[in-house]
Amino acid sequence: MQMNRRLFGLGLGSLGLAACSRSVTARMSTAEPEGLPADLLPASNRAYDAWVVSFRERAMGQGITSATLNTAFQGAGFLPGVVTRDQNQTEFRRTLEDYLAIAASDERVEKGRAAYARHRRTLFAIEENTGVDAKIVTAIWGLESYYGERQGLIPVISATSTLAFEGRRGRYFERELIAALRIVQNGDIQASRMTGSWAGAMGHTQCMPTVFQEYAVDFTGDGRRDIWSEDPSDALATTAAYLERHGWVRGMSWGRELVSGSPSGTVIQPQAGGPQFDTTRNFRVIKRYNPSEAYALGVGHLADRIGGAGPLRGSFPPDANGLTKNDRIALQERLTARGFDTQGADGVIGSNTESAISAYQASRGLPVTGTPSQALLQSLR
């Protein structure tokens, strides 16, 4: 999640804390716990240990039992990498064109359609109960954790206690830590299974602990609200419950790309020269999940694609380097054909493409910039 970004978490976007999760560009590690980098393993820190002692008193004063604290903090500890990630967040902004290309990539759409079909009965039951479009719920799932594949493996007790101790947003994260302990105390999850992102976002749809407390649903009826389970039912129902409580209107779409006809809602054009979108009240409800306009458009567009719609019909202007999407795809294809693998040709310039450009430039004795350009494209013809 993003603190002000998202209430639930992107799956795609920038790091922040919103409702249940994350943001606009990348995703979490899928490594096994033993594969976590060293800086995300507990490290000795006497000041942290002393803080935990004082925190225990405050937690017990709020109804957390000594037994819960003992169990939850067994094996927990200070994670230096969490502090580093919190302090080194950068404002990395993609264009809307790039963001939507990632959010509704062919692979994400294909996986989304498969997930939608596989969990159709559950999704339709959730839609019947809440009124929230099953495709919207599926799209949020896809952006937040790639349909459950990238939920994060960092212990939530360690992550939130580290951030509460570190102090930059100590009061906020102490509330999240207390909420996480209540979840354990309630029996929804064992502390050892409560894992998520470095910021404490959890489960299939990347819920922060306080949001879990207020909105989590035991859809399966097993007595636990398990948003981490291989069965995503509780997590999907929780996401729908959040949207319902924030004003989702049954039977109303999120909006549409405005290609023809008169608008019926609020028209937005997030990227100058790009497509316009006619948005509804439900679009604004999605923004309660994550206030990023790009995120909400990503959810809506991915949901449409999961439902069988095609790509956007409108075009975007050339980028800052003078390249259109087709130019960027051609550049990636030509670099790969020359032996400089860009790891795919989607028109999005990322680190793989920049590395391939740099390697090509070095092989030709050119200044190594890693920057795409029309001249570079022409040289590859």
What are these regions (language model features)?
Residues L323-R328, T336-L380:
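Short acidic, glycine/serine/threonine-rich helix-capping segments at coil-helix boundaries
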Residues G35-E57, Q62, A67-T71, G75-A76, ...:
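Extracytoplasmic and endomembrane cell-envelope/extracellular-matrix remodeling and assembly machinery
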Residues Q74-R121, A125-I126:
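Signal peptide-directed extracytoplasmic domains
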Residues C20-L40:
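Bacterial Sec signal peptide processing site at the extreme N-terminus
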Residues D49-I64, S105-L143, L153-I154, T162-R171:
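Export/targeting segments at the very N-terminus of extracytoplasmic proteins
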Residues L69-F92, W141-S145, P155-I157, S260, ...:
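Acidic helix-start/capping segments at beta-turn-to-alpha-helix junctions
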Residues M1-R27:
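N-terminal export signals
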Residues T84, R150-I154, M194-T195:
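Short, solvent-exposed loop/turn and secondary-structure capping segments
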